[in-house]
Design a protein with these regions (language model features):
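Bacterial N-terminal signal peptides
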Residues: 12-22
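Second-shell residues forming the walls of enzyme active-site clefts
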Residues: 55, 96-113, 129-131, 191, ...
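Hydrophobic faces of well-ordered beta-strands that scaffold small-molecule active sites
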Residues: 61-68, 87-91, 119-125, 173-176, ...
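Active-site mouth loops of central-metabolism enzymes
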Residues: 63-73, 143-157, 232-246, 308-316
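Glycine-rich, aromatic-flanked loop segments that form ligand/cofactor-binding clefts
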Residues: 110-138, 158-178, 196, 204-221
Length: 382
């Protein structure tokens, strides 16, 4: 195991100098996390001040969301958090035993952020088969079950209930709702774009009412995919026009109506052969930059699906995936299970910037989007 690093104090000192306010707790009754404070400054001014205060290494760390292995913060997870300045954590059943234990774990994780930027702490709590700690935290109904009620407002009510339950044990991001059309295993609200759009829009409103970060997935839609991308690659043979008229409609509706700092969009690992041959969406500039940012004018955070899924890991090294994903337009690399994958990806991005393969301004563009979300939801500006 690599040697344990010394504590990282630079970002704490810089933020104290810039913001000149003590860290405060979030709303009473919620798990403590560092709060970002600005002195009567607009969010954009705070973003630029923070960006100027950060080293390249700290910026790159904010672009990673990783999984940890234990039920508490241990030496390995501490090393990852501090050595690589990690900006986000995702938890799975392996990390979660009881509600109180999860609350303490998340508090311990946030404590590692000190006076710097708070962590995104995420979970997949879609409902139905995709829900964590089911015996301790009763899961929401599946998206299919909610859709079958025929009442979109039920999606809003369940989103609010889910957000409250997750916040109470220290989470601040839910990687839901699924905006795919006709996905199997009960993960989709329906089989038509109109139905899915109505329910996704309602779910988004529920999360927003609770001031909770949510994530639309899996752009540009996995409903046509025939192979589970956890296992291997799948090819979608649809034109951009066909995607726009069907698969993309729920995403486009949210992009048009919602504030980009309120949510992420997750890109999937399917290959859309009529948009870009042999290139999965998660590493495709055509799909992320030209389509999602260009055509649809999305200005928020793009997060990849897990870079260790079979659709990528059978064909690419994790470090290559990270480099290609950032070049394509992604802001956050999701690495759920293996510490070394995250470390290798971080080092590859660092070398790429140092060698001029990626500009630091490209990294700054991602950081601006990430910081806007953290300033909006994980701290209070005054």
């Amino acid at each position: 195991m690599p040697r344990k690093p010394s504590p990282i104090n630079l970002i704490c000192l810089l933020l104290m100098a810039i913001l000149m306010l003590p860290v405060v707790n979030v709303e009473a009754g919620h798990t403590d996390q560092p709060a970002i404070k600005c002195i009567s400054a607009p969010v954009e001014d705070c973003v630029e001040n923070m960006l100027r205060s950060m080293t390249l290494e700290e910026k790159l760390g904010q672009m990673f969301m990783i999984g940890i292995q234990g039920t508490d913060v241990d030496e390995e997870s501490l090393f990852m958090l501090h050595q690589y300045h990690i900006g986000g954590i995702i938890l799975f059943d392996r990390n979660m035993k009881t509600q109180e234990q999860v609350k303490q774990l998340n508090a311990h994780l946030q404590a590692q952020a000190g006076e710097k930027l708070p962590l995104f702490i995420a979970v997949d709590e879609e409902g139905g088969v995709v829900a964590r700690m089911k015996e301790q935290l009763p899961p929401p109904p599946s998206a299919q079950e909610i859709g079958e009620t025929g009442t979109p407002d039920n999606a809003r009510l369940w989103a609010r209930k889910t957000a409250r339950a997750l916040r109470n044990i220290g989470f601040n991001v839910n990687l839901a709702p699924v905006a795919d059309i006709g996905t199997g295993r009960g993960r989709s609200f329906g089989n038509t774009p109109v139905v899915v759009t109505d329910f996704v829009r309602s779910a988004a409103s529920g999360y927003e009412q609770e001031d909770f970060i949510y994530c639309l997935k899996h752009f540009p839609g996995l409903g046509r995919g025939k192979v589970d991308t956890h296992l291997d690659s799948t090819v979608v043979d649809a034109s951009r026009r066909e995607l726009m008229k069907w698969d993309v409609m729920p995403f486009q509706s949210i992009i048009r109506e919602k504030t980009p700092a309120d949510y992420f969009i997750m890109v999937n690992h399917a290959t859309y052969s009529r948009l870009e041959k042999n290139v999965p969406a998660s590493i495709s500039k055509v799909i992320q930059t030209d389509f999602l940012r260009g055509k649809l004018e999305y200005q928020g955070v793009i997060i990849t699906d897990d870079i260790a899924m079979g659709a990528l890991s059978k064909y690419y090294a994790p470090s290559d995936v990270a480099l290609r994903a950032v070049r394509a337009g992604a802001d956050i690399i999701l690495s759920c299970h293996v510490y070394q994958n995250g470390a290798d990806a971080y080092h590859r991005l660092l070398r790429a910037v140092e060698k001029g393969e990626i500009s630091e301004e490209r990294i700054n563009a991602s950081l601006r989007r990430i910081l806007r979300v953290k300033l909006t939801h994980l701290g209070k500006t005054t």
